[in-house]
Regions:
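Acidic/His metal-coordination segments adjacent to aromatic residues that form catalytic metal sites
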Residues: 1-18, 81-106
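The feature marks the first
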Residues: 1-43
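Conserved alpha-helical segments that form or flank metal/cofactor-binding pockets of metalloenzymes
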Residues: 43-80
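Alpha-helical scaffold segments that form or flank carboxylate-/histidine-based iron centers
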Residues: 11-19, 43-58, 100-101, 126-136
């Protein structure tokens, strides 16, 4: 991920803070996606949630976690995974409905793009900037 010349350069405090914060929020959001998947009734929505979990947020989590590990930094805590439940087992008054889930996902995707743009703007290391550029797309 980091090339040899940039790997020798230390991270500045903003890069460390934002890498660590991004990893923490991604770990928390992965658990949120598990909960929302339990609440979703529409199969297309469940498939979409599975896709962004497996192909969107999980690879981002792994890449940022590897950067922090390789830098010798302590990783943020991860909340425990949630068990799979059937949507019918969730009381109607406690259940998110499908339009609410879709709106929550839309909001998170937009916020993620803004955060990635901000991190790209403050990064000194080109490889980190490029990584968040990939996350942005």
């Amino acid at each position: 991920m980091l090339n040899q010349s940039q790997q020798a350069e230390p991270f500045h405090s903003g890069e460390i803070f934002h890498l660590w914060s991004f990893l923490l929020s991604t770990k928390e959001y992965l658990v949120t996606l598990q909960v929302l998947n339990n609440h979703a009734g529409d199969q297309d929505l469940k498939d979409f949630l599975d896709d962004i979990y497996e192909n969107g947020y999980t690879p981002e989590e792994e890449q940022v976690e590897n950067i922090l590990k390789n830098a010798g930094l302590r990783l943020p805590p991860a909340p425990p995974d949630r068990p799979n439940v059937e949507v019918e087992d969730i009381p109607a008054g406690a259940r998110f409905n499908d339009p609410e889930i879709a709106n929550l996902i839309q909001r998170e995707l937009m916020v993620s793009k803004m955060i990635c743009s901000y991190i790209m703007g403050i990064c000194v290391q080109e490889d980190i900037k490029n990584l968040f550029g990939e996350f942005h797309t």
